Design a protein with these regions (language model features):
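Glycine-rich loop(s) and the adjacent beta-strand/alpha-helix scaffold that form part
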Residues: 47, 62-67, 74, 78-84, ...
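Conserved redox-cofactor binding core of oxidoreductases
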Residues: 1-75, 320-323
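Non-transmembrane alpha-helical segments in soluble domains
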Residues: 6, 58, 62, 121-122, ...
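Patatin-like phospholipase A catalytic core
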Residues: 1-33, 207-228, 234-238, 288-290, ...
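A short acidic-Thr-Gly-centered motif at the start of a beta-strand
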Residues: 57-63, 95-102, 333, 339-349
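A glycine-rich dinucleotide-binding beta-alpha-beta segment and adjacent secondary-structure elements
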Residues: 18-19, 34-41, 71, 77-80, ...
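A conserved FAD-binding loop/helix module that cradles the flavin
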Residues: 364-373
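FAD cofactor-binding and catalytic pocket of flavoenzymes
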Residues: 137-273, 278-281, 324-328, 349, ...
Length: 373
């Protein structure tokens, strides 16, 4: 399927390059191996050839004598402070016992994700921080933005009835298209990249498709079947689809934000967030460009779209805010404490011993994953 995509994309003057993955191809130490396509990557890496916080950060720190205590099934409620307003630690909920405990520390580092870190800070009110910890600028939760997303899936008749073999390769996509155009000639800002999915990879969670819907492409009206008939159709069509996804950059807006809901708490009694987020014309026009590009590429490769092209009434298939889970901006960094929450080192302007090290401080997320995922 990648070869068909490359052919179709290049015909539309869309660049295609190998995808960038955090997977080792050369040995860097004795703790992690190199990828040799040994197993299903979705089930975790047996040789620690890929990046994960556990195998690459926590385990090495423990082995080198680092003092790390892991509190599993625990959720931070607030950052605790003293009379001077400095952080003294955190209060957290043991979700198994449904009890609240406190931990003391000289420095508090939050990495709960953009929205959850904002929630913790906003819930950490005190006499010294009546608007939430580190929120003298009133910007915690503001400028929330996510990647744009749009998709199209197609059927490639050329790929049916193939011999079944393993096309897994390295886990994740193998090729993709970075942004390739000049925005000065377009009606929207920023851009997006294209991800490519498909092939005969080993089935994983969520695998499945409506076999009967493929028969219509060959004028077959049968309703499918069970046993041998179903198995035959599955083998016939498996690996003959290709998915194309666009992931783009949205423009940060102060009017897009999360805040503490004054009327709702979770089952542990902790106030939850509520969201105010609307796409602008910029993102909607970007989504239209995605769909037009996908349609052209699929036509070039001889594919048949599996669903209708979304129109203006559906924002051209633009995914809902939050769907791509690339949230950034809620604790934005900057030099001016009145216009930002953290400094260039992701430390709160208001509290010198609290850091936010997730994607919250990023003022923009380009069209890439803001952190390792």
């Amino acid at each position: 399927h990648e070869l068909f995509y490359i052919k179709g994309a290049r015909k539309s003057n869309v660049k295609v390059i190998p995808s960038r993955l955090s997977v080792l191809t050369k040995r860097i130490n004795n703790d992690r191996g190199i990828c040799f396509y040994c197993a299903g990557c979705a089930k975790s890496c047996n040789v620690y050839g890929d990046f994960s916080s556990g195998s690459c950060l926590i385990f090495p720190a423990q082995k080198s004598g680092g003092q790390i205590d892991l509190y599993v099934n625990s959720m931070v409620r607030t950052v605790t402070t003293n009379d001077e307003g400095k952080a003294t630690g955190v209060s957290f909920i043991d979700k198994d016992e449904n009890k609240e405990y406190k931990l003391k520390g000289k420095v508090v580092v939050l990495a709960a994700s953009a929205c959850s870190s904002a929630r913790i800070l906003l819930n950490s009110k005190s006499k010294q921080h009546p608007n939430g910890l580190g929120n003298s600028s009133d910007l915690i939760g503001k400028y929330l933005h996510d990647s744009t997303g749009g998709d199209m899936m197609a059927f490639l008749p050329q790929l049916i009835d193939r011999k079944t073999y393993n096309e897994d390769g390295v886990g994740g996509m193998h090729v993709y298209s970075p942004w390739w155009l000049d925005n000065k000639k377009l009606d929207f800002a920023r851009g997006y990249h294209i991800e490519v999915w498909g092939g005969m990879g080993a089935p994983t969670y969520g695998t499945g498709f409506n076999v009967n819907s493929f028969n219509k492409f060959f004028g077959i009206n049968k309703a499918g079947g069970y046993g041998d008939v179903l198995r035959s159709d599955m083998k016939k069509y498996y690996g003959s689809t290709i998915g194309i996804s666009g992931r783009g950059e949205s423009v940060a807006q102060k009017t897009n934000y999360c805040e503490i809901d004054p009327n709702k708490v979770d089952k542990y009694g902790v106030p939850v967030l509520r969201f105010n987020y609307q796409w602008t014309d910029n993102e909607i026009k970007q989504a239209k460009h995605m769909q037009d590009t996908f349609e052209e590429i699929i036509h070039n490769m001889g594919g048949i779209p599996l669903w209708g092209k979304p129109g203006k009434d559906a924002n051209y298939g633009l995914n809902k805010p939050g769907w791509i889970i690339h949230e950034v901006g809620t604790t934005r960094m900057g030099d001016d404490p009145k216009k930002s929450v953290t400094n260039q080192f992701e430390r709160l302007h208001d509290v010198s011993n609290v850091y936010v090290v997730d994607a919250g401080p990023f003022v923009s997320q380009a069209d890439k994953n803001p952190t390792w995922t």
